[in-house]
Curated annotation (Swiss-Prot):
Mg(2+) binds at H443, H521, E599. Residues 295-414, 440-590 form the VOC domain. This is 3-dehydroshikimate dehydratase. A divalent metal cation binds at E134, D165, Q191, E239. One of its GO terms (biological process) is 3,4-dihydroxybenzoate biosynthetic process. Belongs to the bacterial two-domain DSD family. GO terms for molecular function: 3-dehydroshikimate dehydratase activity; magnesium ion binding. It comes from Pseudomonas putida (strain ATCC 47054 / DSM 6125 / CFBP 8728 / NCIMB 11950 / KT2440). Homodimer. Its cofactor is Co(2+); Ni(2+); Mg(2+); Mn(2+).
């Protein structure tokens, strides 16, 4: 299908937008009238610019408030339409979007609306042009696609057809299944926009909160599937009104837009297959299926020699063993349970460059996959950027792709005993024994600039087939934190993404420390939280101190005896229980050099959350720790 995007979806000048659209790989573009009005060149120059860039002008928009206008305005509106037709012919497009009338004095008589639309179609048809009629969700008399099709069907003019917009239907909780009743050749154009589910005025919702398919919470595939079932094979276009998009980097946002269409096509193809609705091969994007995942293979920290020594000491106090050194690089391996941590201090390497840019930080995460080549092919099909580092003789070459912040995601197949990447690349100490009982990485949390959250969500959903939980808002003493968790389909990889638009929150401090986004929190799973915390305290791990008032509140909320509450308080263990009786015990370290911190976690009886009930007290405790005012519990 022809992939298109409206110029209003991107920031920048019209030439910048068109260049970004072409660079991203779109086939076409909707020219939004304001972009043309603010451009100093002529419509013919815009037409030539698009031709030079290899993109077609799929549509000109919008033409407003025509049908049902007061009768004394009808001729003026027809004159206005003729001027727009002149402009369209200069642009070289034959289709204009006419949106339903929103004027308070618009007339609603059905036959009058039919006659007006037929008249407009006649004027357009004489010039070889077409009218696409679209229902605005806030239209005065017409606000659903069913009404649009009813009017278009009665007008019965070959130059008049339907334009379908996902937001205008789904925002009103409309049922798209009846789209199947519209002949495919009468659907002239399709616009797609996702959005978070919000309880607000639909006009404000549309103007400020639309996003690319896959970034929001609407059923995009459920809307597109019945359209394709009609036989429609025309353009599939993005029309996004979003405050953040208006300020986002143009090329990066355009690339996200194309990725979102590819993701939507895949999801729609899968939906149609589930519904046993045949569709010819090649119509929709068909990438390699997502690989199965099995957690994190290793984490790689960018350090220098001094920081590596300090972080290594921290990890050893947490129970990690120094398991080996790289055969040819300044890289150290630490292990505990199924957790592998690499400290990369190699000069003139990717890790070194990352350290220079961000300081001590997580520069790479290795995902354990069933088929690394299939996973890499899928990632590159979704326009992921592959990475190849320097590989020494007899060393294992591990494929990787860049994350949106420039860090790396390695794709690692689990080798057999004696034939893993650790065996080939490291001189292993077979006598090294971890002193702790941490088992695996439970989850990792990222601090992101607010404007980048949607891009990260789409990246993981498309390249790796992750699912996204609903967004939650969490209280920090100095503002609000918004969090949206991603997880692999198998549940072994979990990535809460955190943003804050306030300058003094913990997330804001992390962004300042990293000079950009980064992992600020890593959680390790264990079988016995009290044993692990007792050992960590004895080893001198600096644990985050929790106010005693928190435990008084626990006593009020849960039926705990005094001895158990005292144990929780002594070890600074936080507690939560879900509606099904699942339990969470977790404790936090203080941040390593004011950057990232670790969490020790124990889940019981199927608890699957992240302890949202404890976020406020944890963030308050971290704020006090930053100011040096933390209070130790006294029993």
């Amino acid at each position: 299908m022809q992939r298109s995007i409206a110029t209003v979806s991107l920031s920048g000048t019209l030439p910048e937008k068109l260049e970004a659209i072409a660079a991203a790989g779109f086939d076409g573009v909707e020219i939004f009238e304001n972009d043309l009005l603010y451009y100093a060149g002529s419509p013919r120059q815009v037409r030539q610019m698009c031709a030079d860039l290899g993109i077609a002008i799929t549509l000109f928009q919008p033409f407003r408030d025509f049908e049902g206008c007061r009768r004394d305005r009808l001729q003026k509106n027809l004159d206005r339409a003729e001027r727009k037709f002149d402009l369209m012919q200069e642009l070289g497009t034959d289709l204009v979007l006419v949106c339903s009338n929103v004027q308070a004095d618009a007339l609603g008589d059905e036959q009058l609306l039919v006659d007006d639309l037929r008249l407009l179609g006649e004027h357009a048809g004489k010039r070889g042009l077409r009218i696409g009629y679209e229902a605005l969700a806030w239209g005065r008399h017409v606000n659903t696609y069913q009404q649009v099709w009813n009017l278009v069907r009665q007008a019965d003019h070959p130059a008049l057809g339907v334009i379908l917009d996902s937001f205008h239907t789904l925002s009103l909780k409309g049922d798209p299944s009846a789209i199947r009743d519209i002949p495919g050749d009468k659907i002239f154009f399709v616009q797609m926009a996702d959005a978070p589910i919000l309880a607000m005025d639909v006009l404000e919702w549309s103007r400020h909160f639309r996003c690319f398919p896959g970034q929001g919470e609407m059923d995009m595939a459920g809307f597109l599937a019945p359209i394709l079932a009609t036989g429609y094979r025309g353009p599939l276009s993005l029309e996004i009104f979003n405050d953040g998009f208006r300020a986002a980097p143009t090329r990066q946002n355009a690339a996200d837009g194309l990725r979102s269409l590819l993701y939507l096509e895949e999801q729609t193809r899968l939906r149609l297959e589930q519904e046993n609705t045949p569709i010819e091969p090649g119509v929709l994007f068909s990438p390699p299926p997502a690989s199965a995942y099995d957690g994190v293979e290793f984490l790689e920290f960018a350090v220098d020699e001094a920081v590596g020594a300090r972080l290594g000491n921290w990890l050893k106090r947490l129970g990690f063993a120094e398991a080996g050194k790289h055969r040819s690089k300044e890289v150290q391996l630490l292990r505990q349970g199924d957790i592998n941590i690499v400290l990369n201090a190699e000069p003139y390497s990717f890790g070194h460059n990352f350290f220079e840019a961000h300081g001590p930080s997580l520069c790479a995460t290795a995902l354990r996959v069933k088929d690394q080549q299939a996973a890499l092919k899928r990632a590159t099909a979704f326009r992921g950027q592959p990475f190849r580092g320097l590989v020494g003789p007899n060393e294992c070459e591990v494929p990787a792709v860049r994350a949106p912040d420039g860090s790396l995601l390695y794709l690692v197949e689990q080798g057999t005993a004696g034939h893993t990447l650790y065996d080939t690349d490291f001189s292993l100490d077979n006598n090294a024994t971890a002193t702790g009982g941490l088992r695996r990485i439970d989850h990792m949390a990222l601090a992101l600039p607010a404007e980048s959250l949607d891009s990260w969500v789409l990246f993981y959903k498309s390249l790796f087939d992750f699912a996204a939980d609903d967004e939650v808002v969490l209280p920090d003493p100095y503002g609000l934190v918004k969090s949206r968790a991603l997880r692999s389909q198998c549940g072994t990889l979990r990535l809460p993404l955190n943003i804050s638009e306030n300058r003094n929150t913990a997330i804001a401090h992390a962004l300042s420390s990293y000079r950009g986004s980064g992992v600020h929190h890593i959680a390790f799973d264990c079988d016995d939280i009290f044993r692990e915390v007792a050992r960590a305290k004895l080893a001198g791990v600096p644990l985050l101190e929790i106010p005693l008032n928190y435990y008084d509140d626990l006593a009020a909320r849960f039926d705990f005896d005094d001895e158990f509450l005292s144990e929780l308080a002594y070890y600074n263990v936080l507690y939560d229980r879900d509606a099904q009786g699942g339990e969470l015990f977790h404790v936090y370290t203080e941040p390593f050099e004011e950057r990232f911190f670790f969490e020790i976690i124990q889940r019981k009886a199927g608890y699957a959350g992240y302890g949202a009930a404890n976020v406020a007290v944890r963030l308050a405790a971290m704020a006090k720790a930053r100011s040096g005012a933390a209070r130790k519990p006294v029993l």
